[in-house]
């Protein structure tokens, strides 16, 4: 796969003047795009993460602020870091960079599935990869509902709105997936350190989530879960997967960029 140079295929969701005083226009969801099915029918497995977590590849320390500050204070972040939404993409619109956790899922799945069956993409590009052939949309999320202690402390200090910035973008992502015209064809599997928030608040129906996975993606249980999803079988609401039993079973992503 040929990678675009840094100045190519970059999408800046800024407001044009870079002053950050108002929120940028939200990117349309899958159901809001003048939809045309992907020519290849879509990818079998689509991996993604909320925008505020997908930028983790750049080492932004503002991750902590986005996980805690209420959404109405997003303008402060926009003003201080007007380019935080810059996204680097490959020529096919897949994500050039993704958090290591997403790449680990990708590496784990490549033990069993073909490279052309899997893609990692940013939320705004889901409509380019989710189609009638798609059977799994897997989401990695850290703070989907904003129910962490830190979020409660900061939002109580700065105002009555208790929804942190990254929770806003997480909900936006889940709403987009839920509105997909192909939603009945695929399962939504959630992993990452924030999955417990969905389980403990029983937000499965609200967010359109089929299954929350706790544990390592390279587990044989995780691969079995994806097999069931691809066969369109019913999935458990929540599953604790077994840890690999030997050193060889533990995988690490080579990088946060996909392999060439």
Tell where the protein language model's regions lie, with residue ranges.
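A short, charged/proline- and glycine-enriched loop
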Residues: 34-45, 132-133, 256-258
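Asparagine/serine/threonine-enriched low-complexity, disordered tracts
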Residues: 7-21
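Radical SAM [4Fe-4S] cluster-binding motif and immediate context
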Residues: 245-260
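Short, charged N-terminal beta->alpha structural module
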Residues: 83-112
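Glycine-rich beta-alpha loop elements in corrinoid/cobalamin-binding modules
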Residues: 101-104, 117-249
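A solvent-exposed, charged loop/short amphipathic helix patch at secondary-structure junctions
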Residues: 61-92, 144-172
